[in-house]
């Protein structure tokens, strides 16, 4: 266990940035999101959650795949270069780290997504324990311990100082790179912090949600349930829930005429949009109820059934906070428990 004095935090970013890019929670106009760190950036390690998850460090909201050029009858296809620079994502919370693990299941399974794989190979995650979890948090439901994030490096902010523990080879390499700022220390204060965090988690309103019955065995029962017919009605199909979610991985692929050729890129999409699964023979999900049901069945039934019980939700609470119609995965789970829900 190491400690970095609070007056050395800026020096820490400067030292890390000497040989790698840094992505950190940056306050821009009152909103905190993960962004590339530059000298003078207002890094915010106090705000619990960024507005969007930091998943776009590995799965960008938009990325070029390749460009096609035509010269007479000759067509040249120029693939986009894969990520080859090292980078650090600093300050991820345990739920968002688990979100990356979910993305790994999707993009690192065969056929491997080479763009995602290149970023994962180059990226080091420095996670920050949640000092004071909020009422919308329910990561405990999915087996996540926000007091002890499982990343390359786990850190804790205690009394303004940063406590640092490397957990992987990547973490050890980064630890060596910043060794001049580290002071060896015991873990007494960190253990006390963990105890305090876990005590808060136990009192959160959604910490003891039951996932009983949400598995592959319940597919037909849940799919055919009349609960969906009423539950979906407030949905505006805005897609906000999918864009702030750490685990949503749906994307579209589009072509853009640059004037000098055609650029193919992919960008995030949303299963809540009417044209998401549109096909030539018209077999897309035609109603908002079907799309709403698909989103939550995927997270709670289909994904765990196909991925060794891993749910495609990490309990970050962003959908609880951001949905303009107060619809979210908590309300879905509670509706099937016949418990209602006030959010």
Residue spans for each PLM region:
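Short alpha-helical basic/polar micro-motif
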Residues: 93, 239, 243, 321
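Active-site-flanking alpha-helical
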Residues: 100, 246-250, 324
């Amino acid at each position: 266990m190491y400690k970095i004095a609070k007056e050395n935090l800026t020096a820490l970013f400067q030292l890390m940035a000497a040989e790698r890019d840094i992505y950190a929670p940056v306050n821009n106009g009152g909103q905190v999101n993960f962004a590339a760190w530059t000298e003078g950036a207002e890094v915010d390690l106090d705000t619990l959650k960024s507005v969007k998850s930091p998943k776009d460090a590995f799965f960008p909201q938009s990325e070029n795949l390749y460009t096609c050029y035509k010269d007479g009858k000759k067509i040249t296809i120029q693939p986009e270069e894969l990520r080859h620079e090292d980078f650090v994502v600093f300050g991820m919370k345990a739920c968002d780290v688990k979100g990356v693990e979910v993305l790994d299941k999707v993009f690192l399974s065969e056929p491997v997504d080479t763009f995602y794989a290149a970023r994962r190979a180059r990226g080091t995650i420095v996670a920050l324990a949640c000092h004071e979890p909020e009422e919308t948090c329910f990561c405990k439901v999915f087996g996540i311990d926000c007091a002890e994030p499982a990343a390359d490096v786990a850190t804790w902010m205690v009394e303004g100082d940063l406590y640092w523990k490397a957990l992987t080879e990547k973490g050890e390499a980064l630890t060596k790179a910043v060794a001049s700022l580290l002071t060896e220390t015991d873990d007494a204060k960190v253990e006390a912090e963990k105890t305090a965090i876990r005590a808060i988690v136990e009192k959160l309103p959604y910490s003891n949600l039951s996932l009983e019955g949400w598995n592959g065995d319940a597919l037909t029962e849940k799919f055919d349930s009349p609960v969906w017919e009423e539950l979906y009605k407030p949905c505006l199909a805005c897609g906000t829930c999918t864009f702030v979610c750490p685990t949503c991985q749906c994307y579209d692929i589009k072509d853009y005429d640059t004037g000098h050729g055609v650029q193919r890129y992919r960008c995030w999409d949303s299963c809540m949009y009417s044209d998401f699964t549109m096909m030539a023979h018209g077999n897309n999900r035609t109603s908002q109820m079907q799309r709403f049901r698909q989103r939550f069945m995927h997270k709670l039934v289909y994904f765990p059934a196909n991925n060794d019980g891993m749910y495609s939700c990490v309990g970050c609470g962003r959908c609880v906070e951001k949905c303009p119609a107060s619809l979210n995965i908590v309300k879905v789970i509670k509706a099937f428990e016949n418990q209602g829900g006030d959010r």
